[in-house]
Regions:
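Glycine-centered short loops/turns at secondary-structure junctions
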Residues: 12-13, 33, 101, 185, ...
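Hydrophobic beta-strand scaffold residues
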Residues: 16, 36-37, 103-105, 146, ...
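Buried hydrophobic positions in well-ordered alpha/beta secondary-structure cores of metabolic enzymes
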Residues: 1, 29, 48-51, 61, ...
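Rossmann-fold dinucleotide-binding core
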Residues: 84-168
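NAD(P)+-binding Rossmann beta1-loop-alpha1 motif at the extreme N-terminus of oxidoreductases
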Residues: 1-53, 73-78, 83, 92, ...
């Protein structure tokens, strides 16, 4: 995300300031002209016109919120949060920062790190209309598409959880189909041929290939979304389902399968490792080389 945004800003003569808890990650952007802000979110909130954040969980977002409001923030600062968090957390953070004069929107992103690098992310954008109009060019610089989810920021994170439910369900579906094929004498290539012919979309093709090839380890050259992150996101879906009295049976199954992988020490594998749990339940080996 940040590399594409830096490229866009550089062309328009503007600068990008970056911060990461792991400063070495932020430093990678220095080589393309970004400025590393070593003094953290408070300094960014004081100096910047627009602030983008991508944080792991609700606790991290709330901590950054405390720092932004304590800065104090620059007048009319716009903050666009791209994290996958619980909608009530988005609503809470929005109310708090807005009381300090900050204009807040949510634009959580669909896509793994490799999609971000290739500018293939999809954003679920929610916030006041004039704000969205003003920062849309920045988001377009980081995405291939934007889904407008209205004026309430928490609807952006609700959209993200609904979308991630689709993705998690696809992973479970592929895992079960591949396991059925394995046990019934079909080749995995037969499964991939069906996917590529009948269901040619990036999510199903991508995870279909990854699962069929047992390509579950994550590395810098083979990015993915880890089991630990999957548990967090599916946990948020289930929490929202409980709060709204909605049955998400597939989410419950995926959560159980991810928990099994975490218990086996596979927390850093891609969440496509759901297939290992399905295989084990079906009497096949449930291990793969990391």
């Amino acid at each position: 995300m940040a590399f594409n945004l830096q490229s866009f800003l550089q062309k328009s003569g503007r600068s990008l300031r970056v911060w990461n808890r792991t400063l070495s990650k932020a430093s990678e952007l220095e080589s393309v002209g970004a400025i590393v802000e070593k003094n953290g979110p408070k300094a960014l909130a004081k100096e910047c016109d627009v602030l983008f954040s991508m944080l792991f969980d609700d606790a991290a977002l709330k901590q950054i919120c405390e720092e932004v409001t304590a800065a104090p923030p620059k007048k009319d600062l716009i903050w666009v949060d791209c994290s996958t968090v619980y909608p009530a957390t988005t609503k809470e953070v929005a109310a708090k920062v807005q009381s300090h004069g900050v204009r807040f929107a949510a634009c959580p992103m669909f896509g793994r790190p490799d999609a971000a690098k290739a500018k293939l992310l999809v954003g679920a954008f929610a916030g006041e209309e004039t704000l969205k109009l003003g920062v849309r060019p920045y988001i377009e610089a980081m995405t291939r598409a934007i889904i407008d989810v209205g004026t309430e920021p928490h609807h952006g994170t609700t959209q993200k959880l609904c979308g991630n439910f689709f993705i998690a369900s696809c992973i479970e579906m592929i895992s079960e189909a591949v396991t059925l094929a394995d046990k019934s004498g079909l080749s995995r290539q037969n499964v991939l041929d069906f996917i590529n012919t009948m269901l040619p979309c990036p999510v199903i093709q991508g995870y279909g290939t990854r699962i069929c090839e047992d390509n579950l380890a994550i590395s810098p050259s083979n990015p993915g979304f880890a089991v630990k992150g999957g548990l967090k996101d599916v946990g948020l879906m289930r929490r929202l389902a409980d709060e709204t009295s909605t049955k998400l049976h597939i989410a419950d199954i995926v959560y159980e399968h991810l928990e099994k992988q975490l218990e086996k020490g596979h927390g850093d594998l891609d969440w496509g490792s759901v297939v290992l749990s399905v295989r084990e339940e079906s009497g096949l080996p449930g291990e793969v080389e990391k």
